[in-house]
C-alpha cells in the first residue's frame, strides 16, 4: 500500500484542506493518506481551537489515518516542526509527502533547500551579524539568502507555506529519506489573512469567525457538522491563567531572585537574557496586580497572554517565537525535552478509517518504533503529550464548566 503524508493542524478543517487532500491523492497515486497533525497546541504558539480528537474527525472528510506530531515539535520553529513531521512520516513508511506552497514549483523550492543545506554555517554567521546590529530575524535571513541566491529566490521565503515547504525538503535532504516530495500551489486566501475573501478562506480568518452564520460556506459539509456540534472553542488568550500560574511557580522556585529566574527561563528555546529579564519584571508586576505597561488587554485592560507577548517581543525575537516560548514555559518543555523524541521515537495514532486500519496492519510487522493506540504501556514515553493534553483539557473545563476526558480515557477515533 502506498501512503502519502500530509503535515497538518486542521485548526479547523476547511475547504483548502479538502482541496489539498484530494490533490495529494491525485498527484501521488497513493492508496491512503496519513495526516501528521499537531495535538492540542499548534506551531504558531497557540492553543488549538478544538481538541485533537475532534480535529482528527477530518477522517470523515476523507483522511484515512491521523497520527500526532509530538508536542515538542508542534510548538517549535518551522525547521524543527518540519523535521519532526518528516521523522514521523519516515517511521510510518510514507512513500511521499504533499505540502502546500505559494510557489507551487517543486524544482525551485528543492533548489533553494539544497542551497540552504549546503550553506548552514554561512547562514548562521551572517544572520547573527545582522541581528546583532538590530535587524529583525526575518530581514536578516532575507538579506543572507539573497546573497547566496538572488532576489526572486530569496523572496520565496517571505511566504509562510513556502518557508515550511523548504523546511520539509531540507529534512528529506539531510536525512536522505526515501520520501518523494510534491507541492500543491496554495489556493484562495493567504495563510495569515484575517478576513474571508474567497471560498478558500484561511484557518486564521475562520477561527475569528467561528460563530458567524455564513461560515459553513467555507468548510466541507461533514467537517461543518462536527464544528457546529462542538462549540467549546478555545482561543489563544485562554492560556493566560495557566501561564500566570507557571510563571509564579518559577518565581517561587527561584526564591524571587532575578538572576536565578533568568537562568531558569533561559532553559527554554528562544528565551534570551533580554526576554528573560522582561519576563521577570512582568511576573513581579503580576504579583502586585500591576499590569506591565504595554501589556494591557485591549478588551478589559487586564494582563493577557497575547498582550504580554506583544509587550516582551523584540526586533531580534519576533512575536511567533515569543508565543512559542511562553507556551513551552507553560508546558514545562525546556531544551532538554527536544532530545526526547530523538532518543525514544514513537507513532501515536489519533484516529483511522477502514483503509487506515488496513494500513496499520500492513506496516505493523515492519515498523521500527512503537505504534501506539493504547497509552497505558507507554506513559513515560508519551509524558509530554499527555501533560499538554491535560493542561488543554483543564483550560476547556475551566472556561466551559464541562469535564474533558484525557488521553488515558480516550482512544483513537474510528470511522
Report each predicted region and the residues it spans.
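Short beta-strands and strand-loop turn motifs
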Residues: 6-7, 36-38, 67-70, 182-184
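Glycine-rich loop at the start of a catalytic domain that most often binds anionic cofactors/ligands
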Residues: 46-57, 80-83
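Active-site cores that bind ATP or allylic diphosphates and position pyrophosphate for catalysis
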Residues: 69-415
